């Protein structure tokens, strides 16, 4: 029986992935570089160290990776202030689950400071009983560590937890952890 529902954040609850794609492209362009959208899609659901490794391999230079990341972050942080949107039905879903007595948790590859900022902006942060972030794990999604820790923090076995995810990496993470996984893909990214 499912007793807890653990949500991914980016692309599942808030539309940050669309902003991230725009910011990666703009940051690279400002530095005179190109970044392919297929490469950016590899970042979805991954921790920052994993993203940096992907970029290091792609560009062959950690200095280039650092420069693109810094500019992307500046652009994204500005965009979030005015363009961040809640995914349709997210707030209502959380409210219904809480009212029905389910434990509601968050498992995001984002850092806690980012998750807290973004979710407070859309009025969702206080709805989560437990929060697991990218800096809490050594191995990011698709490794199961994120969801295993989220289940542990929730106080339930993985088979008692449902995971709500939008990315392939996140779904693989939840499935490998032994959770029930519900995929809600962001159709604008397909």
Label each region the model flagged.
Residues 1-41, 176:
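Active-site neighborhood of HAD-like aspartate-dependent phosphohydrolases
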Residues 1-3, 95-98, 111-190:
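Asp-based, Mg2+/Mn2+-dependent phosphohydrolase catalytic module
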Residues 13, 86, 104, 139, ...:
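Conserved SAM-binding loop
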Residues 19, 43-47, 85-89, 110, ...:
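Short beta->alpha linker loops
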Residues 27-28, 47-61, 118, 150-151:
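Helix-loop "lid/cap" segments that line or gate small-molecule binding pockets
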Residues 30-33, 60-63, 123-127, 155-156:
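Short helix-capping segments at alpha-helix termini
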Residues 34, 55-92, 100-102:
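Metal-dependent phosphoesterase signature
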């Amino acid at each position: 029986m499912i007793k807890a529902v653990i949500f991914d954040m980016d692309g599942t609850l808030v539309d940050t992935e669309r902003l991230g794609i725009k910011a990666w492209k703009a940051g690279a362009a400002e530095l005179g570089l190109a970044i392919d959208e297929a490469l950016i899609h590899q970042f979805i659901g991954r921790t920052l160290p994993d993203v940096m490794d992907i970029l290091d391999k792609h560009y062959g230079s950690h200095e280039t990776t650092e420069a693109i990341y810094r500019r992307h972050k500046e652009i994204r942080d500005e965009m979030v202030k005015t363009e961040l949107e809640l995914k349709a039905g997210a707030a209502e879903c959380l409210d219904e689950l809480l009212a029905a007595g389910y434990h509601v948790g968050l498992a995001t590859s984002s850092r806690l400071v980012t998750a807290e900022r973004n979710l407070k902006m859309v009025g969702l942060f206080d709805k989560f009983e437990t929060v697991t972030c990218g800096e809490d794990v050594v191995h990011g999604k698709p490794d199961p560590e994120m969801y295993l820790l989220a289940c542990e923090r929730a106080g339930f076995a993985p088979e008692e937890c449902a995971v709500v995810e939008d990315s392939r990496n996140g779904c693989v993470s939840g499935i490998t952890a032994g959770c029930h996984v519900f995929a809600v893909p962001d159709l604008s990214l397909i």
